[in-house]
C-alpha cells in the first residue's frame, strides 16, 4: 500500500511537471486550445498589473500574439496536498526590446473529475509594474461557495490580513498547512518556517487591508483572490494583489499556498 501511494504521488508530480511545461509553451505560442482543455471552469488569473480575469478573459488575452520570446521556467517546484497540486516557479524571457526579463508564478491545479485541471494562476514580473489594472476585476462565474463555506473562508481571509498587520505568528501557526509556501513580492518563495519568521517581524507598511475579495470553492479546495491597499513607509498609497489556496481536511481549512504581488 505504501509503495502504491509513493508511485501514485510520483506519477502526479510528473503529470504536473508536464502540465507546467505545456502551460508555458501554450502561453508563448498563444495556444488557446491547450488552455481550453486544461483550465477548470472556475479558473481565474491574477496578472502583473493587478488585474483579475476569469477563464473567458484569460483565453481572450492568450489568443493575442505574445510580444515576448524565449519564455522558460526556472527552478520549478511542485508539491501536492490532498487534491491540490501547486506549481511555484520563476521564469525568464526576452522582452520585445530584446532585453532580458524575469518573473515568477504560482499555478494551482485541482484533481477534478479524474484529472488535474488548473484552477488558479498568479503571474508576476520583476521588477513589479505599477498596479494600473487593480480596478479591473472579474466576478465569480463558477465555483461560487455555499453560505457556510463562504463565511468560513471570508473570516479566515480577514484574519489572515489582520495577522500580517499585527505580526500574529500564533494565528498563522494554527492555520497554515505543514506544506505551506508563500510566493513573495520580490520573486522568492518562503516555506512555512521562513514565512513565520518573517511574520514575527513588525510589518513595514501601515493600514494594510483587503479589498475586492473573490472566494471560490471546488469540493475541498478554497480559492481566494483579493487586492490589498496600504500606506508605504514614505506615506504614499500602495496596492497589491494576492491569491491564497486553502485545503479542507477533517473539517478544517488550512492554507497551503499564498502568492503576493505589490506595485
Show where each model-derived region lies:
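A beta-strand edge to alpha-helix "cap/lid" segment located at domain peripheries
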Residues: 2-37, 42-174, 179-263
